[in-house]
């Protein structure tokens, strides 16, 4: 019998080619390293339709690879109405994404929609609450984004482990 995944997480940014696929890959590795891949389903999506079907931005993929994360199997897609029923958590990168996702959400949805950096200890210290879009910037922006995402996804996994995982195993 195949064990059904009991928690699901969708990471969302604007185009689904930089921030959300990075979060997807980083969190997927954290989940795998903790032996929780059979419990947690992970995906990513965007609120804009410019890049549907395309792989992540080369700079995101290269930066992620430097740190041991693999984005090669990911392809951009749009947030869909069904995501609000299929995902327990929808974690967005910035306040514009948060507004856009909330506007798309059906009134009776069950998903918890919030900023990814709500789970980052570092962001509270540095007063950073959004993952900035590195698309139009230089290489340093991709480093910064990866560091923010690593901290927040580890914090989110700690939150899940403390509040849900023991009940689901």
Predicted regions and their residues:
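Conserved active-site segments centered on acidic
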Residues: 1-86, 159-169
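Hydrophobic structural packing positions in well-ordered secondary structure
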Residues: 13, 64, 91-92, 149
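Helix N-cap/beta->alpha junction signal
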Residues: 20, 94-95
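Phosphate-binding/catalytic loops
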Residues: 89, 95-169
């Amino acid at each position: 019998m195949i064990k059904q995944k009991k928690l699901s997480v969708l990471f969302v940014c604007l185009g689904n080619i930089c921030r959300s696929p990075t979060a997807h890959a980083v969190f997927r590795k954290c989940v795998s390293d903790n032996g929780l891949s059979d419990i947690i389903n992970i995906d990513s999506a965007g609120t804009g339709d410019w890049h549907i079907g395309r792989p992540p931005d080369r700079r995101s993929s290269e930066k992620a690879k430097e740190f041991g994360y693999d984005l090669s199997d990911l392809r951009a897609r749009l947030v869909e109405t069904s995501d609000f029923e299929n995902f327990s958590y929808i974690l967005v990168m910035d306040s514009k994404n948060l507004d856009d996702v909330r506007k798309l959400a059906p009134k009776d949805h069950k998903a918890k929609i919030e900023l990814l950096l709500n789970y980052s200890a570092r962001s509270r210290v540095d007063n950073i609450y959004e993952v900035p879009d590195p698309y139009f910037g230089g290489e340093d922006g991709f480093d910064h984004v990866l560091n923010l995402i690593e901290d927040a996804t580890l914090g989110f996994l700690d939150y899940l482990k403390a509040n849900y995982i023991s009940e689901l195993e």
